[in-house]
Structure formats: C-alpha cells, structure tokens
Design a protein with these regions (language model features):
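Hydrophobic alpha-helix feature that most strongly marks membrane-spanning transmembrane helices
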Residues: 74, 106, 130-133
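Zn-dependent metallopeptidase/amidohydrolase metal-coordination segment
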Residues: 112-170
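A local structural motif
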Residues: 80, 107-114
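Midchain, well-structured core segments that form catalytic/ion-binding scaffolds
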Residues: 1-93, 119-122
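Divalent metal-coordination and catalytic microenvironments
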Residues: 2, 48, 101, 128, ...
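Catalytic-loop motifs flanking and including active-site residues across diverse enzymes
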Residues: 1, 5, 97, 124, ...
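Short, low-order "capping/linker" segments at domain edges
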Residues: 91-105
C-alpha cells in the first residue's frame, strides 16, 4: 500500500513551476514493518511535504492526496491515521514592498537577480504576508555555497552588513 501511495503522490504532482496548478508531494520519511522476514508488515508510516504557490492550491493538493490515500487504505482494508504536522503557508509578495526592496538595493548598488518564479520551498514568513503586506528576499552567498538548509550550509558572516544595510535602507 505504501508503494501505491508514493506512486499516487507522483501522479498528483505538477512539477512545472510555471504551471498554475504547480504542486509537489514529496515523500520525506518512510517506515514499514520490522526486520522479520517471511511475514507481512503490520505497520507502516510515511510522511510527505506538500508544496504549492498559493494557500488554496495547497489545501486542494492536500485534500486530493488524502482522498487517494484513504482510497488505497480502504482497498487494502487498512486503518489509516493521518496528521498534519507542520504547515508552511504560501508567501505572497506585495508589489509595493517588492518595489521598496528593489529600490533600496539599487540605491545601495547591490546586484540583484529576480526569479521569474518563487523559490519552491516554504517558510513561516508566509504566515505574515497573509495578514500584512510584505515580501521575501534572499541575500545570495555565491554559486559555490551549498544550498540553504543543506547539512553542509554555513552562513557566510560577511553577508550580515549587507543585510543590515538593506533593511536599514528599506
């Protein structure tokens, strides 16, 4: 059943970041049975991260996926327990705030790269931008720096003055 659930997650994904229905359903943890050979697993657990650009799409992706998970559990006569552990609300940048950030960066002579699509990772910051105007930006640490949240990422302290100056300018 767990293999079917993972397959269903892949089927429900829309991985094209430019697509209006962009959604990722990524397995992040799996545990099945125990190391007792010759018997079927009596327990399984699987965790997913679900991502999309907008909160309503996130809720729809979650509902679509959970309906399919329940269907698979029913087909295999399994008892399903589900829990939403962590929600990272989608971040919606406010155009006026984005302009203030870009104007400030230009005034400071900073190089800027504006992505055509947002980063696909979620942050708690989205909870703020759902209630008050805001925008999320990053300070680049170079192409040879490991990606943020990678185990080998080490924040380059020399970025701190740039960030402080930019926030002060904004």
């Amino acid at each position: 059943a767990i293999a079917e659930i993972v397959t269903e997650a892949l089927r429900l994904e829309e991985t094209d970041e430019k697509h209006s229905n962009y959604r990722l359903i990524t397995p992040v943890f799996t545990e099945i049975g125990s190391k007792d050979y010759g018997i079927s697993a009596g327990y399984g657990e699987i965790h997913f991260t679900i991502r999309s650009w907008h909160q309503t799409d996130m809720e729809a992706a979650t509902n679509d996926f959970m309906n399919e998970v329940q269907r698979i559990a029913d087909e295999h006569r399994l008892r399903l327990e589900s829990e939403i552990v962590a929600v990272f609300a989608s971040n919606q940048n406010n155009e006026d705030v984005v302009k203030a950030i870009t104007d400030s960066a230009k005034q400071l002579g900073l190089d800027m790269t504006e992505r055509s699509e947002p980063f696909p990772w979620g942050e708690d910051f989205g909870l703020f931008t759902q209630r008050i105007p805001g925008a999320m930006f990053g300070l680049g640490s170079g192409k040879n720096t490991p990606a943020l949240h990678n185990p080998d990422y080490d924040y380059p302290d020399e970025l701190t003055p740039t960030g402080v100056n930019l926030f002060y300018q904004i």
